[in-house]
Amino acid sequence: GGANVNGPKWMTKENLDPAVLVRWQSEIEQTGFDAECTALTDRAGKEELRHTLRSSQTLVRAFELAIREGHLPLEWSHLLLLTDRSGIVLSTAGSPDKLGHARRIGIERGTRLDLPHAGVNAIAMAVRLERPSHVRGDEHDLRLFREWSSLCTPVAADGRTFGFLGVCCPCPGESSDVELIWIEFYLQVLKERIARHCPMRRRMALDRRFGEYGLSPREREVAHYWAQNMGGLQIASRMGLAESTVRSMIKNIYRKIGVSDKGQFMRHFLA
């Protein structure tokens, strides 16, 4: 229906190639998957979890910051999930009772929600297809997911997927279009916030802006460090330059940008 208003096109089980579903089903069956289990028990190992949390640090911090910044109606009966690129849960958010329920059914940091471990669900689908996915109640393989509708979208910036953002909501039979539009808006807001807090993304955006002022590649590098509040000496040793060279480059940068001190420079770029 009207679910894809200005948003990504959601992949559903219906518009999936039947051959793909058959392949998935046989893959799931080979793992000795128990559709009737009352809680998910598959977790990432300690080492694997430590590794994925370390490499997804920026993403997790951005997610938690976005949640804290609020304007997201958390009294909503929804559970938000952030996973790494393979579907391992990195962070969860929602009302205390939703989080409590999630824990009871085994959804917490480290839970595997990918296809072999959790059957067909929106997170598993999005991980496989790298596309926004929507799975309704009864379409889930796991009985414990059948009272939920799940939606999931890749968190991508500059052509690279960093992880996945999922929403589970209790479904009275069918998710209404209004609900879907809401969730889509919600996911969009979170994705933008996450991208905004991603240093890589910020670095590229800053780089473009420095370029617009005609800064040379070396000046751009100095400007990056300066924007991170590094001192002249620190920048000099990092770049293998004399401090006096860095100082004169900073003067040049100010001239090109049209600012006269560090405060103005910071305000100009960190607004």
Explain the meaning of each model-derived region.
Residues G1-T111, M125, A227, G263, ...:
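Intrinsically disordered, low-complexity terminal regulatory regions
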Residues R85-S91, S95, I105-H197:
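Sensory/regulatory domains in signal-transduction proteins
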Residues A124, E184, H224, S237, ...:
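A cross-family signal for key residues in well-ordered alpha-helices
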Residues C198-R218:
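Regulatory hinge/linker segments at domain boundaries
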Residues F210-S216, A223, A227, S244:
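Strongly charged, low-complexity linkers/loops
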Residues R220-E221, Q264:
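Pre-recognition alpha-helix immediately N-terminal to the DNA-recognition helix
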Residues N229-Q264:
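Recognition helix of helix-turn-helix DNA-binding domains
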